[in-house]
């Protein structure tokens, strides 16, 4: 939900990359917020109300592709949200269909874009909700490498950037310290830009880093058109 306002280009780039890989993209108008922020705030009933809308909205699609790690993690936890309740089985079915963009492309057999005209060094930041909550680390790296990009690993890759859902709102001082530390580690790689898979991380890191910070989809999409992602 925040991504549509803060960085709508991520959604546009995601659609483009999926279509370049032969995926029919269907925008389901009945979908709702995933409910993750409700859960962060302790509002379980509100999260369940939103989740029920999504259980119904996504019944007839093959996959639910997410380009925000926090949302993907939240939807994959629907079975826990409905544990012991009538919706549990349907929640399990939906959770199995939820895939991060990088995972779906990696599983389908990624058709990479032409490599950049100039060498491009990319530091990859692992979003906690992708690497830790979903166990996804290698898929986005494989996509970037297949596109001819040099992927650099920062120190303390496992460290949170300080965004953490609503954590940066309620613990701003600690969040700032984490954000600056993460930015320093990414800068130290000597990269031309940073790639990540979550809008919260992207926004947080960009506040403390003087390098472009892009979503993986934003990095790949221009390459299909022969353009420089830094432009």
Question: What residues fall within each predicted segment?
Answer:
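Iron-sulfur cluster-binding electron-transfer modules in prokaryotic oxidoreductases
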Residues: 1-231
């Amino acid at each position: 939900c925040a991504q549509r306002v803060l960085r709508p280009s991520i959604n546009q780039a995601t659609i483009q990359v999926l279509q370049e890989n032969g995926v029919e993209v269907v925008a389901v108008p009945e979908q709702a917020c995933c409910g993750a922020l409700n859960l962060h705030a302790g509002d379980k009933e509100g999260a369940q109300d939103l989740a029920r809308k999504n259980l119904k909205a996504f019944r007839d699609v093959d996959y639910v592709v997410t380009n925000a790690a926090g949302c993907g993690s939240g939807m994959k936890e629907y079975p826990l949200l409905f544990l012991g309740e009538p919706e549990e089985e349907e929640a399990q079915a939906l959770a199995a269909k939820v895939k991060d963009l990088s995972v779906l492309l990696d599983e389908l057999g990624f058709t990479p874009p032409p490599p950049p005209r100039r060498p491009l060094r990319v530091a990859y930041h692992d979003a906690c909700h992708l690497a830790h909550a979903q166990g996804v680390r290698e898929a986005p790296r494989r996509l970037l490498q297949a596109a001819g990009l040099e992927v650099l690993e920062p120190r303390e890759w496992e460290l949170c950037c300080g965004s953490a859902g609503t954590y940066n709102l309620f613990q701003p001082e600690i969040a700032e310290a984490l954000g600056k530390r993460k930015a320093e580690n990414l800068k130290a790689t000597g990269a031309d830009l940073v790639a990540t898979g979550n809008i919260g991380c992207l926004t947080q890191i960009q506040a403390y880093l003087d390098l472009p910070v892009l979503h993986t989809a934003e990095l790949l999409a221009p390459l299909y058109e022969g353009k420089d992602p830094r432009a």
